[in-house]
Every structure is written in C-alpha cells, then in structure tokens.
UniProtKB/Swiss-Prot annotation:
Annotated spans, G2 motif: 155-157
SUPFAM superfamilies, per the entry: P-loop containing nucleoside triphosphate hydrolases (SSF52540)
Intracellular or extracellular location(s): Cytoplasm
Originating gene: dlpC
Name this polypeptide is given: Dynamin-like protein C
Phenotype of null mutants: Produced cells are larger and a large amount of them contained more than two nuclei.
CDD domains documented for this protein: DLP_1
Length: 904
C-alpha cells in the first residue's frame, strides 16, 4: 500500500472512529438519562453513522477519480499535441525536398511549353472577404513571410496581385513591382479600364493575362523583364511602396478605389508557382458608391472559371450573418471552385464549452452538403523574421488544437478542417491538380508539333528538289491572289484565322500596338467586345467604337480670364466687343490642342490592326496543304518582300487619310456655322468649365445612348468681369461640344471611306501589279536567297524534331511517374480503408477525385506529408463543365502504347 493510500485509510479510520465515538457518547448519555432507550434505537444510530461514513467515502473516491481523469486527459492532450508537433516538423523537412522536386519538374515543363508556344497556365487564387477578415494575413501564411500590409487600409483601395515564382536560388524573398504609368491617373479617379478580370489563356477574359503577358508563372525565363522595375524592393519596404502606388492612383483621401491592380512578383525557394489576388474588402456600411464599386470589382476578379476563390469569414460571425459567402455564391453557386475559410478561430474556440457546441459550430450552417470550411488562427505579432513567423504559426495552430482536444471534439470527423497547415496542404493539392490538368493536353500538343514538324520537313525537301523560276512565278501570283482574298475575308468577318490564337482583347491591343495611349483618358466605359479576342474587321470596328467614347469624353480645356480678355479685341470699323469672335478664337485654339492628337492615334491604331492581318493570312495559307502554290510561304525573303509591299500600301492610305481628316478639321473649325450648332439637339448644355469625371462619364453614356436633349441660346455682355468671362467660355465650350460631336461622326465616315475601303478595292491590284512587274533577275535574287533560307530551315526543323521528341518523352516520363504514384496511393487507400472507415473518406485520392468532379472537400486529416505526385492523373478524355472544372474517367491511360497518339 502506497503512502497516499495509507494516509487516506488512516483519515477514513480516524473519521469513522470519531463519528462512532460521537454517536456512542450521545447514546450513552441518552441511556444514562433515559433508561427506557432500547437496543433498536441504538442500532438505528449505528446504521446512520455507517451511512454517513459511506457517503463521505464515495465523495472522496469521486474526487480522486475526477482528478485522475483530468490527469489522464491532460496527458493524452499533451501526447497528441506532441505528435501533432512532430508531424508538422517532419512534414516541413519532407515537403522541403519533395515539393522542391515538384517545383523543379513543373518549371521544366513550363519552360518546355513556353519554348513550343503551348499553353501551360499558372494556377490562380483570389482571396475575398470583408474588411478585417484577415485576407492579407492569410496571404502572408501562404507566402511564408510577413510584410505588414495588414497594418494599413491599402488593401481596400486597389487589388494586389502577387505572382509567386519558385526560384531555388532565392533563399530569401526577392520582390519586384511591375512598372506603372501614372500619366493618365488622378486623385479623383474611381476606376479605370477593366484590367482585373481575366485569366491565363482564357479567351473571354484574356485582357488580364497575368500568367503570360504580365509575366507570371514558370520561372523568370517566361517573364518580360522590361515590364518590371530594375530594382528589388526589400520586404520591410513593401508596405510603404504599396501605399505610394495606391495613393498615386486613387489619391490620399481614402474615398476612391481603382480596379487597376498592383503587381508584385515574389521569387522564393520555398513557394509554389502561383498567382494570388488580394482584393479590396467588402463593406457592410458606409459610402454606398464605394461599396458598389468594390463589390463589382471583386466580382470581375472571381468570374474567370479557372480561378480558385478563397472566401474568408471571421469565426466570431454567426453562420446566419455571413456576408462574403452569399456574394461569392452569386458567382459560384455550388462553391465548386471555392475554399471556405473561417479566420481568427482563436476568438471562437475559447467560447466552445463542450463537445456538442464544438461539433455544432464546426459542422457549419447553411453550407452545401459535403462542403466543409476550414478554421484557422494566425499570429498576432508583427515584424517577425521568417523562421519566427513559421514557429508562431505552429504555436497558434497547436493552441487552437489543444482547446478542441480538451473539450473532446471528434478528431476523425473535424481534424482535417483545423489549422492553416490543412489549408496549405489543400491548396498544394489543388495546385498539383492544376498542373496535372495541363500535363496531358500539353503532351498531346507536343506530339502534334512533332507530326507537323515531320510534315514540314517533307515539304521543304520537296520544294528544294523542285525549284525553277517559271514554276515559282506561277506560285507567287497564285499565292498573292489568295493572300488578297484572305485579307478581304478577315475584314468581312471569318473565324478561319482562329481568334483564340490570333485575336486580341482591347487591353492586349493597347499593350502591343506601340501607340501612345489616348491623352487624358481614364474611364472604364463599356467598349463593345472589349473582353473578346478579335482581329480584322471586328477589331477595327471595336476601335471606332472606342474612339467615339474617347472623343466624347474630351472636355473643354481650362481657359484663364487673361485669355478671354485678350481674345476680346476691336474691329476694323468699330470698338464694340464681339463675344462670338472671341469665343470662336478660343474654341479654335483649344479644339486643335485637344482633338487633333486623336486623329494620329486612331490612324496609327487602325494601321496596327491592318498590319496584323499579314501574319494571320500567311499562317492560314501556309496550313493549306491542298494548294501547291502556298509552299512559297516557306521562302522568308519572299514573305519579307510581300510584307514590305503590304505595309507600304497601309502607310500610304494612312498618310492620305490623315491629310483628309486634318483638312476636314480645319474646315470645321475655320468658319463656325452657328445655324448648324443651333439645330443640334443631341447635346444638352452643361457647365463646360467645371466638370467632374463622373459627370463626364454620364454625359458620354447619354450621347452614346442617343438621348435627345435641349439646346441653349447665346448671351452677350460687355464688362470683362467674372460674368463676362463665364459667358464667353460657355460660348466657346458650346462650340467645342458641337464640333466634338459632329467631328466624331465625320472621322468614322472618313476612316471607312479612305482607310477601310482601299483595303478592299485597291490592295489586291497594288500587290499583284508589283509582283507581276518584277523581272526574272529579281525573282532569281529573291529565291536564290530563299534556297539558302530553306536549307537553313531544314536544319532547324530537323533539330526541332529531335528536341520536340525528347521533350515529349520527358512529359511521358512525368506522366508514368504520376500514374505509378497513383497506383501506390490507391493500394494504401485500400489497405487503410479496411482498418478505418472514417479515414477512407478523407484520404488524398478521394479528395482529388471529388475535386476533379467539381467538388472541393476536406484534405487528408491524417498526414501533412505529401509526395510530389500524390494527385491522380487518369484518362485523357476531359469533359469540361460550365464551371470549367474537369471530370476525368477512371481507367488509366497507357501512353506507352505505340498507337496511342494515332488514336487521339
């Protein structure tokens, strides 16, 4: 017997003896005082004493049992926490090597795809939520380091797009911002062109091609370096730089937002290749205009179907009162591409008193079946070094987990939903799926390139063996004729050029045309088809529509009172002021300054659109193997000669059209026809001198919507006071608005008559005449050089074929490794399911299969360790749904079958 047990026995014996003695003393006293007390009463007293003794004994035993249970529970909690901590530590070391292998592998695949012009999209996450829901802290946890953006309100005014690039050589984060042009921005701008809705290689939204055109994904080899700042920004200066860029675009008042994103490129050895969008927070109250602008901006960001939405809500907000989730549901009704995350869980977990209350909360209310949210807490401390930040995240997670264990929550049921590590693992799995979804199509495209290269080699060899001047002349004339016809078809409207490949959105057109932007234009009008990839006549017509919006948005320039006073001179025959003459002079000068530059820009943009058709037409004709004359497209020197004549023709009509337009502008402004203006009812008079951007926007929309409004009479005055100044300026502004309206219509007509029509009527004869008049010597010079070019091209094609086959085999090797890993995981899954039914519902394989069928579920709760090929990759037939998720049939592909690619 232990010392404690002996002591307890002694206490019980002592207490029992004391109680018995007390009762005995009382009884003896009673007997002595009452001789009539019988033995039955004595027995009752003894029984009562024994009962009291037993009750006291039970209480002591209950206290001891409770104390033992608490000690056992505490020991179990400590053991589980230590196991969880060890699991986290082990996963860090394992993932450090396995993920690095994966990143390196997919970097190679992305570079191969880039070299062969194959689409290989970088996955994208869009983080949305209310203000103070912890969006920036969540992003920091994915990045692995803090940059203190959460201490400011800058995230509420401009989207921040972080392009994470895995770079093994960067053991510390390397951060660079994308260059920005603030020349057309001003503090009062509420928004700008819709540059934030789009995706990589998704043609309905290609204007925001951050993965390719803006430089994201796949390592720095794919980046257009001149779009990024030459210098790196230290991590501790990121916040200051983001604030500066935000204020430059939206002003310092804090009451404006801009849809133009800030791009931040982060190269780091310990991150995935991923684009993350940090969005302005939804507003619950305050300025209704600001709430609406933010809501619309975020909707545009989450609309692209390829983007994964991370919807954050604070854990202390009741399920029925959530705001972000209903807004996201409007865009993603079944949450098929949405991850639900409840932040600041540490504020909620301390309110959970028992197992039942914990389970009720963790199950969630009003959420689609099988859609389980994550619950995370993140460190509150700021300015932590990278390794301390990781340790703080670990301790924060373990603290939440400890509190849940203490109230006995079901680990098997809810463990996979707790902590940032489960979210990160889940996101990693999704990234692997996205990469794998790219793998098979890329492999098929590589095989197609191999076959095309083999066919090109055959064509070049045949052309080299059959080459003489007479034959080449005939081929050239047929090719030129077909080329002219193809240009006409592209202008009239045709999809033969593949808009997905050759089309441009309005943003892409502006970025690639090398033409200066519209001066002083900073509005987000709904330009027709601006988000669609167009070429030819459709792209030209979109430009004219944009031009009308631009010219109507031009306001009468600020005019000083000195200018007005100087413009009111004297007549040859009298000294009476002529206000109409003063207003006319001011109007003529200001109109030339504001409107004339637009002529140059619209003509240069028109020429750019027409010049693009050369490459499109040559590509179409070169793919037509049924026409033997199209083999002349193999001769680079001939194509350069043809392109030279084609662009010479465009430059000629551009010059002629510019001359006519400027002459017409002089005609319109030289002599003012007041009767013409007085009959104009489309323009409603307004204060031409003080116009806000919002008023300009509404006025342009009303004009473009053809609303009929009233006119205004002229007025006179003699004194050069403020009233006279206002009247003269209003007259000049009235003249300006009239010319602005009529001239926009005139330019459209002139462009169609003197720029577009010659492309139909004169281009064919111009190019045909040129080549028909070339002498034999010129042909010999042109095609003798072409023979050397063909020989060089043959060598390049042969080398390309070798390289392409090597890369194709590399893709096959990756695929086989994934398939092998899948089989191993399936075997492990089968084994574990026989031991535990609950764990089989949460393993990684089933999670992936559910995700690929459009449902995201909870990641594996039993392990944070993930090999680089945990995700399954099966049957090649992709069935694309409306939400752009992919179903994959379950039988594995045998790509090693020699006839596989022939069958597909």
């Amino acid at each position: 017997m232990s010392h404690q047990q002996q002591q307890a026995h002694f206490d019980i014996s002592s207490n029992s003896t004391l109680t018995t003695n007390t009762i005995a003393t009382t009884t003896n006293a009673s007997v002595s005082s009452s001789p009539q007390l019988n033995k039955a009463q004595m027995a009752i007293a003894e029984a009562m004493a024994l009962k009291m003794h037993e009750e006291e004994k039970k209480k002591r035993e209950e206290k001891k049992r409770k104390r033992d249970n608490e000690e056992l529970l505490s020991k179990q909690v400590r053991t589980k926490l230590e196991n969880e901590r060890k699991k986290l530590d082990d996963s860090e070391s394992i993932n450090a090597s396995t993920n690095q292998e994966l990143y390196s592998l997919f970097n190679d695949l992305q570079m191969i795809s880039h070299d062969h012009n194959i689409s290989f999209d970088t996955p994208e996450l869009v983080v949305v939520g209310m203000q103070s829901d912890g969006k920036s802290s969540f992003i920091e946890s994915l990045l692995g380091f803090q940059f203190n953006i959460v201490e400011t309100n800058i995230g509420t005014r401009r989207p921040l797009i972080i392009q994470m690039i895995n770079n093994p050589s960067k053991q510390q984060p390397s951060c660079r911002f994308k260059k920005e042009d603030y020349s057309n921005s001003y503090g009062g701008s509420s928004s700008s062109t819709s540059t934030t809705s789009g995706n990589s290689n998704h043609n309905t939204d290609k204007q925001q091609n951050v993965s390719s055109s803006q430089g994201g994904g796949g390592g720095s080899n794919n980046l257009n370096e001149d779009k990024w700042e030459e210098y790196e920004t230290p991590v501790n200066e990121l916040t200051e730089e983001i604030i500066r860029r935000t204020n430059e675009r939206t002003g310092r008042a804090g009451d404006r937002v801009s849809s133009i994103p800030i791009f931040l490129r982060v190269e780091f050895a310990h991150c995935s290749n991923l684009n993350i969008y940090d969005t302005p927070g939804f507003r619950k109250g305050g300025d209704e205009r600001l709430k609406y602008e933010i809501s619309e901006m975020v909707k545009k960001l989450i609309e692209p179907k390829n983007r994964i939405i991370v919807c954050l809500e604070q854990s202390n907000v009741e399920w029925a009162n959530t705001i972000s989730r209903p807004l996201v549901k409007k865009i993603d009704p079944d949450f098929s591409r949405t991850i639900l995350v409840n932040t600041k869980f540490d504020n909620r977990v301390k309110e959970l008193r028992n197992r039942e209350s914990a389970h009720k909360y963790l199950e969630g209310e009003g959420i689609i079946a099988q859609k389980k949210p994550f619950f995370i807490s993140l460190p509150l401390k700021r300015n932590l070094e990278t390794h301390r930040f990781k340790d703080a995240m670990k301790e924060t997670f373990l603290d939440d987990y400890r509190k849940l264990l203490e109230i006995g929550f079901d680990e098997n049921r809810f463990g996979g939903q707790i902590g940032i590590y489960k979210v990160r693992q889940y996101v990693e799995n999704l990234l692997h799926e996205k990469y794998q979804q790219n793998l098979l199509p890329s492999m098929l495209q590589l095989e197609s390139i191999c076959k095309k290269t083999e066919a090109d080699i055959v064509r070049v060899k045949k052309e080299l063996s059959d080459n003489n001047i007479v034959t080449l002349k005939e081929k050239v004339m047929r090719f030129v004729s077909n080329f002219n016809g193809q240009i006409e078809r592209l202008l009239e409207g045709s999809v033969v050029g593949d808009p997905d490949e050759f089309g441009q959105t309005l943003l892409q057109e502006k970025e690639n045309c090398s033409v200066q932007p519209w001066p002083g234009y900073n509005f987000d009008f709904d330009i027709q088809n601006s988000n669609y990839s167009l070429y030819g006549g459709a792209q030209y017509e979109r430009l004219l529509n944009e031009f009308e919006f631009v010219i109507h948005s031009k306001e009468f320039p600020e005019t000083s009172i000195n200018e007005v006073a100087s413009a009111i001179g004297v007549s040859k025959s009298h000294n009476s002021p002529i206000y109409e003459l003063a207003a006319t002079n001011i109007f003529q000068t200001k109109s030339k300054k504001v409107l004339l530059p637009l002529i140059d820009i619209v003509l240069q943009r028109s020429s750019y659109i027409m010049k693009r058709l050369f490459d499109i037409s040559v590509s179409i004709l070169g793919k037509d193997e049924n026409e033997s004359s199209h083999t002349v497209s193999l001769y680079e020197h001939f194509l350069k000669e043809l392109q030279s004549q084609y662009e010479k023709f465009i430059q000629t009509i551009e010059s002629e059209c510019k001359s006519r337009l400027k002459d017409d502008f002089e005609m319109f402004t030289k002599i003012v026809d007041w009767n013409l203006l007085s009959g104009l009812t489309e323009i409603k008079p307004y204060n031409y001198l003080k116009v806000s951007p919002e008023e300009t926007k509404q006025r342009v929309i009303s004009i473009m919507d053809c609303k009929k409004l009233e006119d205004e009479p002229l007025s006179r005055s003699r004194n050069i006071d403020d009233d006279t100044y206002q009247k003269v300026c209003m007259i000049a502004g009235r003249l300006f608005s009239g010319i602005r309206f009529f001239f926009s219509k005139l330019i459209r007509n002139k462009l169609n008559a003197f720029f577009l029509d010659p492309m139909f009527q004169k281009l064919g004869s111009f190019v045909t005449d040129y080549f028909s008049k070339l002498n034999d010597q010129k042909y010999e010079e042109m095609f003798q050089l072409g023979l050397k070019e063909l020989e060089n091209k043959l060598h390049k094609l042969e080398f390309q074929l070798i390289d392409c086959k090597k890369n194709r085999d590399k893709f096959k090797d990756v695929y086989n490794r994934m398939k092998q890993s899948l089989n191993q995981n399936q075997n492990q899954n089968s084994s574990s399911s026989s031991n535990s039914a609950s764990s089989s519902n949460n393993n990684v394989i089933i999670k992936h299969q559910q995700s690929l069928n459009g449902k995201f579920s909870t990641p594996d709760k039993n392990s944070l360790t993930m090999s680089p090929f945990t995700s399954p990759f099966t049957q090649s037939n992709y069935h694309q749904h409306n939400n752009n998720n992919y179903q994959i049939n379950q039988q594995p592909l045998d790509i090693n079958n020699d006839h596989y690619f022939d069958q597909n």
